[in-house]
């Protein structure tokens, strides 16, 4: 079975895209990241989240920049801490996006 990690349903969450198995929208996850939440803190505070779901939310935001423009820095990366290289190990290639999922190198 393949899980669609980001789901959009007009009858759920007013149609706002959300992470499968949670009541957290992509916007909620981006708000957490931009306020300084790391992946480990998100997973600790929201045990219903999954590593893959958070990465999919970031990737979804990257594909829908116009909808989530407030969360992008001037260099085009998502604001806030992303995945470290170690946290990104094991993610599928489509989610290993520098600046979007993986925090940019200084």
Predicted regions, residues:
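Long, charge-rich, low-complexity alpha-helical segments
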Residues: 24-106
């Amino acid at each position: 079975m393949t899980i669609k990690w980001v789901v959009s349903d007009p009858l759920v969450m007013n149609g706002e895209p959300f992470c499968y198995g949670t009541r957290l929208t992509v916007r909620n996850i981006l708000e957490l990241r931009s306020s300084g939440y790391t992946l480990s803190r998100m997973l600790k505070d929201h045990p219903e989240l999954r590593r893959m779901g958070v990465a999919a939310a970031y990737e979804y935001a990257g594909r829908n920049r116009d909808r989530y423009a407030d969360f992008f820095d001037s260099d085009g990366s998502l604001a806030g801490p992303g995945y470290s290289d170690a946290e990104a190990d094991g993610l599928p290639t489509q989610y290993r996006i520098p600046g979007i999922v993986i925090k940019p190198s200084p």
